């Protein structure tokens, strides 16, 4: 594991490091590695508690594999998995779809009424994110979770060139999960139950909620299993910063071979 000393590092060092990661993983950057690294450094504002890893088997991980799929190949995989979806149209999204059913018995949805949700842009996802969520749903199913309430997947960007493909929420490649509901109706709320602290470690040795309540431990177990399985390239939690106090940001990042957890 490579530990970043913080955003106080010179951006040039971070760029060189990111280039080395992409090279050793054999990943194809979406754009030039230097521009990509600079943008990601600004976007994620990496701090002392964040850690970025570049496993040698990155190409074999779900997130990296999904990030390299074409629209046709991705939709073919959805069909193969018997995932219900319809193709959508969405600016900046490479493979926009809308789910029409649960994933392994888990419903991913916003808080809106069904009539609103049917046309809500926030429920549009890039197909590649859906594949990662389908894997994530297997973890959730093992914890008796049947519903995930999220704030958004896609956020339509403003003043966007029609031929430009977005990342994160602009590209519908990230989900902000706020609440997890089990089959008994119990709600695990990230805001109230995660019990983290800004700058604290999220997963791995020495990482633990404080206090370590049963609900906090369940949330941590769910999240860290997803981290261990490399389902998402970027995982941000309440340990990251105040704007993430109430949700997990789960993101597939196309064209990279690294993983950022905070």
Feature roles, as predicted:
Residues 2-81:
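N-terminal secretory targeting signals
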Residues 31, 42-50, 89, 94-100, ...:
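Catalytic cores and adjacent binding grooves of peptidoglycan-active enzymes
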Residues 59-65, 117-127, 163-164, 190, ...:
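Second-shell loop/turn segments in exported
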Residues 60-150:
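Active-site acidic/histidine clusters and adjacent loop/turn architecture
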Residues 124-132, 136-148, 156-189:
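Mid-length scaffold segments of soluble, non-membrane domains
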Residues 145-153, 193, 255:
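An acidic- and aromatic-residue-enriched active-site/binding cleft used to recognize and process polar
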Residues 148-157, 235, 239:
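Short catalytic/ligand-gating loop segments at beta-alpha or beta-beta junctions
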């Amino acid at each position: 594991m490579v530990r970043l000393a913080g955003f106080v590092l010179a951006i040039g060092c971070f760029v060189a490091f990111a280039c080395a990661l992409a090279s050793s993983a054999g990943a194809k950057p979406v754009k030039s590695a230097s521009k990509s690294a600079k943008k990601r450094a600004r976007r994620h504002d990496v701090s002392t508690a964040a850690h970025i890893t570049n496993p040698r088997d990155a190409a074999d991980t779900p997130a990296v594999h999904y990030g390299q799929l074409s629209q046709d190949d991705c939709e073919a995989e959805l069909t193969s998995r018997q995932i219900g979806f319809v193709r959508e149209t969405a600016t900046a999204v490479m493979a926009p779809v809308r789910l029409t059913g649960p994933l392994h018995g888990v419903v991913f949805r916003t808080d809106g009424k069904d009539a609103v949700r049917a046309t809500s842009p926030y429920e549009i996802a890039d197909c590649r994110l859906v594949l990662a969520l389908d894997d994530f749903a297997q973890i959730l199913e093992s914890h008796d979770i049947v519903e995930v309430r999220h704030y958004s997947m896609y956020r339509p960007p403003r003043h966007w060139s029609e031929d430009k493909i977005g990342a994160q929420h602009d590209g519908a490649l990230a989900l902000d999960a706020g609440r997890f509901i089990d089959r008994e109706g119990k709600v695990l709320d990230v805001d109230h139950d995660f019990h983290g602290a800004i700058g604290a470690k999220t997963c791995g040795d020495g990482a633990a909620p404080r206090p370590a309540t049963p609900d906090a431990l369940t949330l941590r177990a769910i999240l860290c299993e997803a981290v261990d399985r490399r389902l998402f390239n970027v995982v941000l939690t309440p340990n990251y910063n105040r704007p993430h106090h109430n949700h997990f940001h789960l993101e597939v990042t196309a064209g990279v071979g690294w993983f950022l957890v905070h």
